[in-house]
A protein has these predicted regions:
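ABC ATP-binding cassette signature C-motif
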Residues: 1-169
C-alpha cells in the first residue's frame, strides 16, 4: 500500500487560552474520500487550513509527499485582485495545467468567465471559487463547506464531478 499523500500527526493548536486542536490526526491517500464532522467552532476549518499550509500548528507533524498538489476552497474566497471570474478561475492553475479546463468548468456551472467578481451573487461566487480549485485537478482537494450558497442543480453537478475526480477529497 502506498504511503499517504498527506499526514497530520498529533496536531495541537491554541488560540489565546483556548485549545482548539489537541492531538488531531489526518491521513489522506490517493483517491481517498474524507469528511470532517463536528460542531461549529470545533476546528474543522482550521485543520483544513493547517493541511493546506495556511495556518501553522503549535506542535505536531505535517508531511506532504514531494510533488503532491493541494487546492483549498475557503468558506469565503477572496476575489479582490481579479477583474473577471475567468481571471480568478485560471489563477488557481499553474504551469502545465490545462488553461481551457477553467473555461470548460465555468461554462458547466453557468458562468461566462466575463463576470465581475465584485458583482457576483453568493451562488455565482461559490461556483467561481469551485472552478478555481477544480480546474488544476490537484492530488488533494480540501473543500470547506463546498455546497454553501449553491442551488440543487449546482450541488448535483458538483457531486457528479467529485465522484469522477481522481483527487483525494
Amino acid at each position: 500500500m502506498a504511503p499517504p499523500l498527506l499526514t497530520l500527526r498529533d496536531i495541537n493548536l491554541t488560540f489565546g487560552s483556548n485549545s482548539l486542536l489537541e492531538g488531531a490526526e489526518l491521513y489522506v491517500s490517493q483517491r481517498d474520500r474524507v469528511c470532517l464532522v463536528g460542531r461549529n467552532g470545533s476546528g474543522k476549518s482550521t485543520l483544513l487550513k493547517i493541511a493546506a499550509g495556511l495556518v501553522e500548528a503549535d506542535s505536531g507533524e505535517k508531511f506532504l509527499q514531494p510533488g503532491t498538489t493541494i487546492r483549498y476552497l475557503p468558506q469565503e474566497p477572496n476575489f479582490s485582485d481579479f477583474e473577471t471570474t475567468l481571471d480568478y478561475a485560471q489563477a488557481g492553475c499553474e504551469a502545465g495545467d490545462d488553461p481551457y479546463q477553467a473555461i470548460y468548468l465555468l461554462e458547466q456551472l453557468g458562468l461566462t468567465g466575463e463576470e465581475d467578481p465584485s458583482q457576483l451573487s453568493g451562488g455565482e461566487a461559490r461556483r467561481a471559487a469551485l472552478v478555481h480549485v477544480l480546474a488544476p485537478e490537484p492530488d488533494i482537494l480540501l473543500l470547506d463547506e463546498p455546497t454553501n450558497h449553491l442551488d440543487i442543480e449546482a450541488i448535483e453537478w458538483l457531486e457528479g464531478h467529485l465522484q469522477n475526480s481522481t483527487s483525494a477529497l
